Every structure is written in structure tokens, then in C-alpha cells.
Amino acid sequence: IACIDDYPGEVSANLLLDRIMGADVVLKKDDGRPEEVQYRELMDRLCKEYESVGEKVYQIPMGGSNLLGMCGYFECAQELTQQSRKNGLKAPKLVCAVGSLGTYMGLYCGLQEADSELCLTGIAISPFGEAKEQRLEEYYAQICSAIGMQKREKAAFHIETAYTRGGYNNPCREVRNAIYLMARQEGILLDPCYTGKAFAGLLDMISEGKIKKGETVIFLHTGGTPGLNTPCHRAEFESELRDGIQVLGERYEKLG
């Protein structure tokens, strides 16, 4: 596992799972250059190191956004289309978090190929600039070429960019409130970086009238719950939730 990041001071959240599974983790301190440049250099160096001792290396990019990962969500979109038709849903909206773009593009192409009635909306969880717009087009062409699908001249990508709330993985009260709502109403855990931020954006879209009362919405949960234990987020959760914890003393336990 290779990341451009500082050591958080403890083995927690994703780092804990990585190490439990036996993965090596390499963290490189940010040197101020574009993160993609640093990441590419780090991955190239690590691949050469492993190959030099006889290892065979398969490189998975950040977010799993390669052709194989995108094809997984291509199939997901087709399965959702089948389920939607089976249940007679009327023009349902499909909403997902958008980070490294692979999930969104796989879904987009899968819906196009299935001539689906689902309308896809992505909610960006980090600033969305020209580089990502260009990468969308590149991923679109890549999938179309790989599966032999007709590439549309003007693809209608719909990604909401107004709900990034200060940037990638930024602790935010509105996101935590969205996490509390989903957990307490549905018993489903969201994470503060991806699904929680996307769900908070979805709630804003409803309050702003972008999604109307009576419309059917499918919110796609893409995982990430270990992020609840990331130190910066856990500290905020603890400060907000501590008042609901009672510690009973020895006298009470004896009377009981």
C-alpha cells in the first residue's frame, strides 16, 4: 500500500486493516508537488524494488480506478437496471460518491450499454477541476474501446461539485450529521470521507429542490466504514457523542 501522507500517529482505520491482512504500507511525506506526480514516482520505485527481488507486480491505482475496477461497476449498473425494471421503478435516480472517477465511469457506461432508465448523478467529495474532467473522457474512451461500446460524441456526465465541504477527507459537522441520520434511521454505517459526504450532498440536493418529493433515489454505498476510526474524524465523533455515555460507579453495581 503506497500513500502520499503523514503517519497519523497510530495504526488505526485503513492502516489497521492493511497490517492485519499482512500488507506492507509505505507513506511518503508530501513535498508540495502535484500528488499524482509524487504517487507515480513512488509506485514506480516500489514496483522496481519488488521486481528486482523476483516478485511479479500488479499495480492498482488509487481508488481502484483501472479498467478492471471500472468494469466491475459496469456490471453493477446492469444489475441495478435489471432490478429497477423488475420492481417497476419509474425514472429512478442513481447517486454515488465521486473520488477517483472509476465508480462513476463504470456505472455511466453500464447504464449506457443497458439503455437504462436510471439517471446517474455523482457527488464529488473533493475539488473537481479540468484534470478530472479530462480523465473522465479518457476513462470513457478506455471502457468503450475495451468492450466495443459506441462512444457518444457529447456524453452527458452529471457530477455535482458544490458539496466538497472544504476538501478531501475534511472533518465536517454536516457530514457527521448525515452519518448519524443514516445510522439511526436505517442501521447503515457511512464513512466521513466518501459515502457520508455524498449522502450529506444528497440531503442538500433534496432541501434545495434538485430532487423532488416523490422521486425514487438509489444511493449506492461504496464502502469505506473503517474511515470512521481515522484519528481526525474519531476525535470529532467523540466530542459530539461523549454526552451519551454513562459510567456507573462501584456502589451502583453492588446495589444491582
Where in this protein do the model-derived segments appear?
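Short beta-strand segments
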Residues: 2-4, 28-29, 60-63, 97-98, ...
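Small/polar-residue-rich loop-to-helix segments that shape phosphate-bearing ligand pockets
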Residues: 4-87, 150, 155-173, 177-178
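Alpha-helix C-terminal capping segments
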Residues: 20, 108-115, 201-210
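Residue-level signal for alpha-helix termini/capping positions
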Residues: 51, 85, 112, 184, ...
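Short beta-strand-loop elements within alpha/beta enzyme cores
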Residues: 55-59, 97, 191
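Glycine-rich phosphate/pyrophosphate-binding loop at beta-loop-alpha junctions
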Residues: 70-158, 220-256
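Active-site-adjacent helical/loop segments in soluble small-molecule enzymes
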Residues: 154-213
